[in-house]
Amino acid sequence: VCMNSTAGTTKAVVDKLREKGVKAGLLKLRMFRPFPAEEIAEALSHLKALAVLDKADSLNAAGGALFEDVTSAMYVNKKQVPMVNYVYGIGGRDTTEKQLESVYSDLAEIVQSGNLGEPYRYLGLRKGEN
């Protein structure tokens, strides 16, 4: 799940993964308010794991703004799917296809192992910045 221009890059990654036979998808949110909670919960309810990409970090321990709303939408609509939040573009850094491919690799690992691990993650940090 993501918004804005990152969805275009993510769509390119999804297309490449699908060509390789990987079950991958993208839900691009076109508007944030009013938040389409019921529609999102229904669209995501069949997934085995999902990632929510946030452009901005949040000053809490629960995740970015989009992640919080997606999590709430799933909870209120009684849909349970393992979810992780990725904050990207820290410091104005570009988000690459390779970084987005790693998100899908992480999701495959979550599905295979059943272990969510750290639910709040960062994309594109330099080594030693995690």
Could you tell me what each predicted segment is?
Residues K16-G25, V76-Q80:
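Secondary-structure transition/capping motifs at alpha-helix termini
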Residues R30-E39, Y122-N130:
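An N-terminal assembly and electron-transfer interface module characteristic of large anaerobic redox
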Residues V1-V22, F35-E42:
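Redox- and metal-dependent alpha/beta enzyme cores, enriched for Fe-S-associated oxidoreductases
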Residues T6-T9, R33-P36, S58-N60, G91-R93:
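Flexible loop/turn segments at secondary-structure boundaries
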Residues D54-N130:
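Peripheral docking tails and interdomain loops at the edges
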